[in-house]
């Protein structure tokens, strides 16, 4: 009785989920190589011109006065529409001040957005189709981008699309025909990023969690049923021969693939559910906030009076600087200049520049933020390790790993070129590290470092899962067709067929 009930639940849940799980597996192959289009800070820097030092006439203190800030969490100098600007943020309030005239930027004009988009794409603005957009579309559906609406959207005949935020003047999204195709093959179906659903964040989240939980259940039931029915002693017969599996046709293939891939299917569905934070998980270690505050302190109005940004840039001679960050590291005011080459220079208020922090300096900064005897060691890493990794190799290297001697064996990864915290691991993060990243992406240390071995193994599992789902789709269609046929067949016809010994269709 219990077995029949489990079979019924597996069958009908499978009918309901077959198409969705098929899409997840098939799009998982795309996700191995293509992500959802996005614009990172490094993308903006790569396309930004170098700062014109001679045009910077406004001090940081003057910029603070212009926007009415006494302090700021972030302050940097960069180029906007060919002019140097200060970008200041205090909490959730962000302001832009032109560093050549001390004028505060209001909402950007269409003409300015035209120049920004043309500079980004390298194409003539006259060839673009332009529209103002306040509504969320497929490429601005992610929350960080959606918050920067309204935008000007530019589309060129070759398929390039550039979205310029009217509020910040930044390019917040950029797509090409290839990147959009990659998203349609991978991220959009895999994440259920259908715009009418995704723009309602809470509803989308609940739906993904429910579908993933149901898929986990259906895979677990299928695996249980398969193990119940599997007979190592070949107690079933088919075509006059003893067999281990009591099914024929598509059911037989479904059972074989399910026994081979059922565990993988179940863990993929479960780990995918974990990506949505279905239940509260422990966060970062308590020392994280103290370390972040030490590495990026609050900037006061007069913090950089001893050396203005223009003077700091001049101290680098002819170096082409794209961005100048004003930071407070361990209560010491510093400038972090990002060069055209991508390298950085750290400039003190005495005008002395260096390329990075040394390992002992980073360790001392962390020790100042926590109990001094908590620091168990600090080392430089030139390659990713098991807790600091990036399959697409976008996270910075080298980094300084600072280990604490606390109960959670906390690990902090700090970029020595910027003194920025770029990674954290604590024993309480094991669920995210191993049950999500480990099971969902197979980001295991013995595998993810080795390409194309990782591609072969993960791709093989994805293809096998897709094949398993193909059998599910066929069986789902057969179940639905049989059920509908019975419902549409008159009752007297069913009784007549039964009396005459004809099988039901």
Regions found by a protein language model. Give the residues of each.
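Conserved histidines in hydrophobic membrane contexts and catalytic metal-binding motifs
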Residues: 1-505
